[in-house]
């Protein structure tokens, strides 16, 4: 198998260029009732003007037809082959909220959910506020401390999300998610995928029943779905591989966790897109690579809220000048996967990609949307090749071979 990162590392010639990777989570979509996607419907004069000066294309996050999770989707655009580096959502969420994870620990991402009888009727418990969710996490910590010889600790995340950490001997992460992924389905318990994870299966399934018992009197957050069981993985450092000083700007814990896992510096920022873009400006001289994450495009796609997804795209466009005035040598606008509103979830569809640089061919595309990207100069490429293009457009790659 070709080791892309090793080849790139040998070709890199550092310079003073600056690269910005703007990820609008779940940006790709399919036409709605009026025949337009949210990107087409949105009023985006800055993105469209940028498209005229850029090379456009689309990415395949993992393989054609494969629907990626957020972890594989991001690893791909960071240049890590998601088929080689398989990482559970739990470790990403845990690192994103600064949970310390050791070699005896097994972590999982939790969603508070609403249960009627044994049927999941809301996988996100009505999207409670982070403050409401934290109170329920406290109830869990007060009532569940240990299962057999395994210590249990819960940590609040953002909105309906939390992290559970199990600490003990012989815990492994080859496990199915304890999440049916759809509403209207019964409780799903985890199942070990190999013999080494049988103990983990037993402990987690007892834990699920304990959570159900403890939360039975809660109105909406009366159950929890657990997924992304994971140990701490070791990944090559992004900075070392690409000879860059990388920084990450994200609001949601999981994406901070992803960035931290590959060795990016996590910058403090506010809650809005404007705050995030201003954080880039404030730190412009300290780093030469900025990963900026916008979450709500994905959230509204999952909710099936077409108009709200349009508004988030327009908010990105409204504030894009904050990035453009910095005059980055390379500005990449893309997503980690598609989240069509009609499907209310991640999908297999290719992801729009736009790369701005003074070295682009430009001239073919007039707008930034799925269909302009599909016919763009970059073609359809694996997401794992985005970083090599970023480095090339930044003038950081030497010639390969004689």
From Swiss-Prot:
InterPro entries listed in its UniProt record: Alkaline_phosphatase_core_sf (IPR017850), ApgAM_prokaryotes (IPR023665), Metalloenzyme (IPR006124), Pglycerate_mutase_ApgM (IPR004456), Pglycerate_mutase_ApgM_sf (IPR042253)
Entry keywords, A to Z: Glycolysis, Isomerase
Alphabetical list of Pfam families matching this protein: Metalloenzyme (PF01676), PhosphMutase (PF10143)
Ranges annotated as spanning the membrane: none
GO BP field: glycolytic process
Broad class of enzyme this protein falls into: isomerase
Catalytic reaction annotation: (2R)-2-phosphoglycerate = (2R)-3-phosphoglycerate
Pathway in which the depicted protein is active: Carbohydrate degradation; glycolysis; pyruvate from D-glyceraldehyde 3-phosphate: step 3/5
A molecular-function term among this protein's GO annotations: metal ion binding
Top-level division of the source organism's lineage: Bacteria
E.C. numbers: 5.4.2.12
Family: Belongs to the BPG-independent phosphoglycerate mutase family. A-PGAM subfamily.
Matches recorded under HAMAP family: ApgM_B
Role according to the record: Catalyzes the interconversion of 2-phosphoglycerate and 3-phosphoglycerate.
Protein name, per record: Probable 2,3-bisphosphoglycerate-independent phosphoglycerate mutase
Species assigned in the record: Thermosipho melanesiensis (strain DSM 12029 / CIP 104789 / BI429)
Gene: apgM
